[in-house]
From Swiss-Prot:
Residues 45-189 form the SCP domain. It comes from Vespula pensylvanica. Expressed by the venom gland. Belongs to the CRISP family. Venom allergen 5-like subfamily. This is Venom allergen 5.
């Protein structure tokens, strides 16, 4: 798979071309470990699908205002190893934020990132980081269009529950920076959500 030939929707050089391997590139940060276990992958996937079903069934009471309306076209996500590989390459740069070009041959790819830190020698489990994205639902106004909501406050939530997204793959790295124990999680989603002229899902 030659990532250097992929032309991303948003331009730029593909992450898997630019960095080319899973070797961590973290400067003076001390890398403790990287990658997700099979169990962690299953947990992340289950957390996404449980939350998508909660939304679909109209059980999410939070919002600005809540509750969130039920969905009629919400499907379960499946894990995709290629998305996970590209997410892991980006996580291994230890740069908090979004990369520019992560699309794969079959579709454009969206992304959620989360970073937590502790002065104690411990790291939050990935599901806790995923729940931080879910919590953004408290700022979502379902009475407005997606494009009229404040994207900076709700973009992780909306990608999680974007109905047309079918697949997910994530990467993770744990490192120490200035005595802070940090856990950085990157999840890539395909096809990408958060297209301004579309809605999250069809309401019932």
């Amino acid at each position: 798979n030659n990532y250097c030939k992929i032309k991303c929707l948003k331009g730029g050089v593909h992450t898997a071309c630019k960095y080319g391997s899973l070797k961590p590139n973290c400067g003076n940060k001390i890398v403790v470990s990287y990658g997700l276990t099979k169990e962690e992958k299953q947990d992340i996937l289950k957390e996404h699908n449980d939350f998508r079903q909660k939304i679909a069934r109209g059980l999410e009471t939070r919002g600005n205002p809540g509750p969130q309306p039920p969905a009629k076209n919400m499907k379960n996500l499946v894990w995709n190893d290629e998305l996970a590989y590209v997410a892991q390459v980006w996580a291994n740069q230890c740069q908090y934020g979004h990369d520019t070009c992560r699309d794969v041959a079959k579709y454009p790819v969206g992304q959620n990132v989360a970073l937590t830190g502790s002065t104690a020698d411990k790291y939050d489990n990935p599901v806790k980081l995923v729940k931080m994205w879910e919590d953004e639902v408290k700022d979502y106004n379902p009475k407005k269009k997606f494009s009229e909501n404040n994207f900076n406050k709700i973009g992780h939530y909306t990608q999680m529950v974007w109905a047309n997204t079918k697949e997910i793959g994530c990467g993770s790295i744990k490192y120490i920076q200035n005595e802070w124990h940090k856990h950085y999680l990157v999840c890539n989603y395909g096809p990408s959500g958060n297209f301004g002229n579309e809605e999250l899902y069809q309401t019932k």
